[in-house]
């Protein structure tokens, strides 16, 4: 899958990500978008997928949802961070 079909969710406003997904579906004639998030951004990723499906692209479907836990090495030692990967198809 091309790297431009992946949306990494962070601290930007929710609608920025929704707009990016809608733009990719409409302009790039892609049929598959992956939304990725870790930690506190997981709930925002779910909101983004739901807003996209219900308000903008009603024919979008969930193809796959992956949940995972990643071990990250930080200043305070190793910590586990949850991650999600939501695949939307059209």
UniProtKB/Swiss-Prot annotation:
GO terms for cellular component: chromosome; cytoplasm. It is found in: Cytoplasm; Chromosome. The modification N6-acetyllysine is found at residue 11. InterPro entries: Alba-like_dom_sf, DNA/RNA-bd_Alba, DNA/RNA-bd_Alba-like. Binds double-stranded DNA tightly but without sequence specificity. Involved in DNA compaction. This is DNA/RNA-binding protein Alba. GO terms for molecular function: double-stranded DNA binding; RNA binding. It comes from the Archaea. Acetylated. Acetylation at Lys-11 decreases DNA-binding affinity.
């Amino acid at each position: 899958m091309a790297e431009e079909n992946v949306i990494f969710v962070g601290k930007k406003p929710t609608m920025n990500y929704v707009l990016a997904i809608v733009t990719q579906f409409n302009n790039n004639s892609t049929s598959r978008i992956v939304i990725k998030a870790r930690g506190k951004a997981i709930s925002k990723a779910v909101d983004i997928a739901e807003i996209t499906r219900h308000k903008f692209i009603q024919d979008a479907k969930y193809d796959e949802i992956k949940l995972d836990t990643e071990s990250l090495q930080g200043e305070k030692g190793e910590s586990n961070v949850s991650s999600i990967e939501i695949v939307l198809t059209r």
